[in-house]
Design a protein with these regions (language model features):
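Compositionally biased amphipathic helical and low-complexity segments enriched in hydrophobic
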Residues: 5, 36, 75, 80, ...
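Amphipathic alpha-helical coiled-coil segments
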Residues: 44, 48-58, 122, 129-143, ...
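Intrinsically disordered, low-complexity regulatory segments enriched in Ser/Thr/Pro
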Residues: 93-132
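Short, charged low-complexity intrinsically disordered segments located at boundaries
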Residues: 1, 92, 159-160
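Short, flexible coil/linker segments at or flanking structured domains
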Residues: 32, 82-84, 117, 124
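Amphipathic, interaction-prone secondary-structure segments
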Residues: 63-99
Length: 160
């Protein structure tokens, strides 16, 4: 057992040193905000409204990404990016389509990348675009899932 004086000096030195380095006090205050439970329906409604604004921004981002890719990199190919989603989905995802708008799916990208007449630079650019598409789709899916869950929670609160 450490004597009380030594224990206080040791703990005090460690705590003071930690709080001075890297602004831990500010970080701890920030992190505590994430750990607080929602206090009520009003906070859920505010969060839902923020997420719906994010969904509108993501919808426009999908349109912009598709337009830029289709008018630039993919212009001379038979491959397009298309914003897609079921009716009522807040944020649309980006899907691969053929330029005739008859087929959709990842298999179109795989078929395009397996062609021998595609330059290595073009292949790498399309792969980079696919990475951007995947990241965007993950963001859109998170927004959609969160809005759906908040809607269910609000409905449960109404029925309680």
């Amino acid at each position: 057992m450490i004597p009380l004086e030594s224990q206080q000096e040791h703990e005090g030195g460690r705590v003071n040193g930690a709080s001075k380095s890297y602004g831990n006090d500010a970080f701890n205050s920030y992190a505590k905000g994430f750990l607080k439970p929602f206090k009520g329906k009003g906070e859920l409604i505010r969060l839902r409204d923020e997420l719906e604004e994010s969904a509108r921004a993501a919808r426009q981002e999908a349109i912009d990404m598709a337009s830029q890719a289709n008018g630039g990199l993919l212009k001379s190919t038979d491959l397009w990016l298309t914003p897609w989603g079921k009716s009522g989905v807040p944020a649309r995802t980006l899907q691969w389509r053929d330029n005739r708008q008859k087929s959709m799916g990842l298999w179109l990208l795989e078929a395009f990348l397996s062609r021998d007449d595609i330059s290595e630079a073009m292949r790498q650019s399309v792969i980079d675009l696919e990475v951007q598409r995947c990241v965007f789709n993950a963001k859109a899916a998170t927004i959609n899932w969160s809005i759906k869950r908040i809607g269910k929670a609000l409905a449960d609160i109404e029925h309680a």
